[in-house]
């Protein structure tokens, strides 16, 4: 697990479309890099690639217990990544802790390794970044919305 503070300013103010200005902690699964420019300004806890899902839950629990020491607010936490982040967000729903402000899903790729969850009712609000109209992320956003979850969709037209 890697801990990084964006620009060494903690707590920090973050502006994200559709979300009020907040100070928050971000648990980043291995689909994204803590050096991606969009994570600048977040208190980031990044998990190494290939870590089992139980480690993600343990990391999220640790962050929720130490969020004040990290300079963020306990009610301002989110998870980010792809399919693993979506499953982590659902695990928080199932356990009732910690309460996530949002899940940020960037090009979530569901498949054999990470099948698309069937029961998404009660999931945290989501921002889903997708590449095309036929993207799995777009389908997952529709599934979340149909279950009554607040969803913001962002069409990524750039190359990654």
Positions of PLM-derived features:
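Domain-scale detector for complete catalytic domains at protein termini or as standalone homologs
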Residues: 1-160
């Amino acid at each position: 697990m890697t801990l990084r503070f964006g620009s060494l300013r903690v707590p920090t103010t973050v502006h994200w479309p559709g979300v009020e200005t907040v100070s928050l902690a971000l648990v980043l699964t291995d689909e994204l890099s803590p050096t991606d420019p969009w994570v600048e300004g977040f208190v980031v806890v990044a998990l190494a690639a290939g870590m089992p899902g139980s480690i993600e839950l343990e990391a999220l629990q640790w962050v929720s217990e130490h969020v004040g020491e990290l300079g963020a607010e306990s009610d301002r936490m989110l998870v980010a990544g792809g399919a693993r982040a979506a499953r982590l967000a659902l695990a928080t729903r199932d356990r009732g802790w910690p309460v996530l402000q949002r899940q940020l899903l960037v090009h979530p790729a569901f498949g054999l390794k990470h099948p698309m969850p069937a029961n998404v009712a009660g999931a945290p609000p989501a921002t889903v970044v997708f590449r095309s109209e036929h993207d799995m992320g777009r389908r997952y956003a529709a599934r979340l919305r149909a279950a009554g979850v607040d969803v913001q969709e962002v069409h990524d037209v750039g190359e990654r």
